[in-house]
Amino acid sequence: MNICNKPSNKTAPEKSVWTAPSQDSGPSPELQGQRSRRNGWSWPPHPLQIVAWLLYLFFAVIGFGVLVPLLPHHWVPAGYACMGAIFAGHLVVHLTAVSIDPADANVRDKSYSGPLPIFNRSQHAHVIEDLHCNLCDVDVSARSKHCSACNKCVCGFDHHCKWLNNCVGERNYRLFLHSVASALLGVLLLVLVATYVFVEFFVNPMRLRTNQHFEVLKNHTDVWFVFLPAAPVETQAPAILALAALLILLGLLSTALLGHLLCFHIYLMWHKLTTYEYIVQHRPAQEAKETHKELESCPRKVRSIQEMEFYMRTFSHVRPEPSGQARTAALNANPSQFLATQGQVEPPLPSSSDTLALPPRIQPQKKRKRRVYRLPRSGVLDRELPLPRLRETGTPSRRSSSSSDSTSASPVHAGGSAGAYYSASAESMEEIPVAQTRLGSAALGAPGARGRESGLALQARSPAVFVSPSSGEPGTPGGGDGLP
C-alpha cells in the first residue's frame, strides 16, 4: 500500500519463488518450487518471443516474395544477396543467443531435473549471501545474480530479454548485440526497398514490371504478380500498395525500437555498466518521482486530511498571539504572572473535542507583531505620594530654601524596594528622564519629557527612584549646601 491507500503498481517476484510456506501446514500446490529454465526454448514461450518470430517471417516473406522481385532487373541479384546475407546472419545469431544457457558454471554443472526449494525470508535476508545462492545451493561468482524469471543464477547478469525468452549474461551478451544490430540493419534495408516500390508505383510503374512474366500483360497494368519467379501469383495493384505501406509502417516502428535499444547498450558499454547496474543506480530517483506522482494522484479530500494531520502535528506547539483585551485583563488580574510569562497569555482550552485548530493552509495565521500598550497619563504616575520629610537642623533661610526646592520638584512615586524593579532592556534607566535637584532628589523632567514618556512601553509597576539618606539636609556635612 502507498501513501494514498492504493495498492502499489510495482511487480513483486513470483509467489512460487519468494513466498515461504507455513510452518504448520505443508506446502500447498501453488507454493511448490519452480523449475529452472535452461534457455529460451524452455517452456513456456513468452508472447513477445512469438511476436518477434512472426515479424521476422512477415518481413522475410514480403521482402523476398513481393518487393525484391519488383526491383529493376539488374538490381534483383544484389537485393537477394544483401538481404539474404543480413537475414541469414540475424537468424543465426538470434537462434544462438536463444539456445545458449547463460547460467553460472556451478549452476550448469548441477542437475536441472527437480524444482528448486522455496525461498524463506525468515531464514535468509537475501537470495545470494556471501557468494552462495540459497536457492541454487551453489557458490556463484561476484557478478552473478539470481533471475526470478529463469529461477537460476546468471553469470554477469545484464537483463532478462523477453524477445529472446532468455537471460542475457556474459555468455550470450555479444550474441544479443549482434542480433539487435543485424535486425536493425535488415529492417532499414527492407524499408528502403519498400519505399522505392511505393514511390515508383505512382511515378513510373513500368520500372517495376521488368520481369519476364509481365511481358504477356503489357495491356493489363492492373494485374501484378507476387512470389516471382518461383511461384507467380496474380494480384491487384491495391494489394501491392497495401503490403508496401504496411511494411514501411512496421519497419519504421521496429527501427525506432531497435535503434533505441542499440544506442542504450552502446552507452552502457561506454560506461562499463550492465542494465541491472544502471537500473539499481537510478532506482532512488525513480522511486521519489513515483511517490510524488502517487501523492498528486490522491483524491483531494484524502490529500487535505493528510496535510491537516501533518500541520497539526507540526504546529501544535505554536501559541496564538493574545489580543489586546486579553493582555490587559491578564495585567489587571495578576501582574506578577504577566511579567513572569513575558506578556504571553495562555489561550483557553477548547470546551469540546470538536474544536480543532485548523492548519495554516486552511486557516492562515497573520504574522505576529509586537504590540506596545500605553497606560493613560492619569494612571500610576499621576498619583502623587508625599516625599519623606528631611530633618530640619538648619536656619530658617535654609529651611525655606529647602522647602522651595522640594515643592519645585515633581513628586516621584516610590514603587518598592530596589529588588522589585523589573526591566526588559538594558536601557531601562533611561526610559524615564529624571532631573536631579541640589539635594540629590529625583524629579521628572520638563513637560516635553513627560510627553515623550507617555509613548514608551511601561511594565505593571513603575520604576522606583530612591533618595539616598546620605544626601543629608541643608547644613549637614553630607548635604549638598555644605560644599564650599
UniProtKB/Swiss-Prot annotation:
Expressed at high levels in fetal lung and heart. Expressed at lower levels in fetal liver and brain. Also detected in adult islet cells of pancreas, Leydig cells of testis, retina and molecular layer of cerebellum. Its EC number is 2.3.1.225. The chain crosses the membrane at residues 50-70, 75-95, 183-203, 239-259. Pfam families: DHHC. Residues 1-268 are annotated as: Mediates interaction with STING1. Residues 380-392 have a biased composition (Basic and acidic residues). Palmitoyltransferase that catalyzes the addition of palmitate onto various protein substrates, such as NCDN and NLRP3. Has a palmitoyltransferase activity toward NCDN and regulates NCDN association with endosome membranes through this palmitoylation. Acts as an activator of the NLRP3 inflammasome by mediating palmitoylation of 'Cys-130' and 'Cys-958' of NLRP3, thereby promoting NLRP3 phosphorylation and activation by NEK7. Also has a palmitoyltransferase activity-independent function in DNA virus-triggered and CGAS-mediated innate immune response. Functions as an activator of STING1 by promoting its cGAMP-induced oligomerization and the recruitment of downstream signaling components. Interacts with STING1; ZDHHC1 constitutively interacts with STING1 and in presence of DNA viruses activates it by promoting its cGAMP-induced oligomerization and the recruitment of downstream signaling components. This is Palmitoyltransferase ZDHHC1. It comes from Mus musculus (Mouse).
